[in-house]
């Protein structure tokens, strides 16, 4: 098949996954705001950061990239720490989701040979355009957290500790 068609197909897939990531973020925000009070919403997103970070360990196991375990595990541990901080500090969620979006893009760029900050095999493989989907979701969520931070801080202060 012609290289032009291959590139066109890839661009269409990337655009679709980015749009789906944005739609997933919008749906998540809509449902969480409707179902959870502000304090619980913040805690939900903090725990969700931990879960989405753990996907990379699942990918490492699935794709059998043994050399990636050390780095991927260390990064997941860092996201767990950020997530735990994010349960109380909105700024940690903003930073955590932004960093996770960058982590997703690094994986996507390495998967396509466009850029690699690490040696071959240090990062796990990911499904096609997963990094684009997840980065779109993560960056949208970080922007939402920035907009929501004052309300979360007020809710935390209103509840006796």
Regions found by a protein language model. Give the residues of each.
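Transmembrane alpha-helical segments of multi-pass membrane transport proteins and ion-pumping complexes
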Residues: 22-29
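Functional transmembrane or membrane-interface alpha-helices that line membrane-embedded catalytic
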Residues: 2-10, 16, 20, 33, ...
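A generic, lipid-embedded transmembrane alpha helix
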Residues: 48-62
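Catalytic glutamate of the conserved HExxH
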Residues: 97, 101, 105
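Hydrophobic core segments of alpha-helical transmembrane domains in multi-pass membrane proteins
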Residues: 71-77, 95-98
């Amino acid at each position: 098949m012609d290289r032009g068609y291959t590139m066109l197909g890839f661009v269409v897939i990337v655009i679709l996954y980015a749009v789906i990531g944005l739609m997933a973020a919008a749906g998540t925000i809509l449902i969480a705001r409707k179902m959870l009070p502000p304090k619980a919403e913040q805690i939900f997103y903090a725990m969700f950061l931990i879960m989405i970070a753990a996907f990379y360990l699942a990918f490492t196991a699935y794709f059998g990239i043994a050399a990636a375990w050390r780095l991927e595990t260390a990064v997941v541990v860092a996201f767990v720490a950020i997530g735990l901080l994010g349960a109380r500090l909105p700024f940690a969620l903003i930073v955590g989701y932004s960093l996770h979006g960058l982590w997703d893009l690094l994986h996507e760029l390495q998967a396509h040979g466009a850029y690699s900050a690490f040696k071959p095999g240090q990062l796990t493989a990911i499904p096609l355009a997963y990094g684009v989907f997840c980065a779109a979701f993560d960056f949208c969520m970080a922007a939402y957290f920035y907009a929501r931070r004052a309300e979360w801080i007020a809710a935390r202060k209103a509840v006796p500790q």
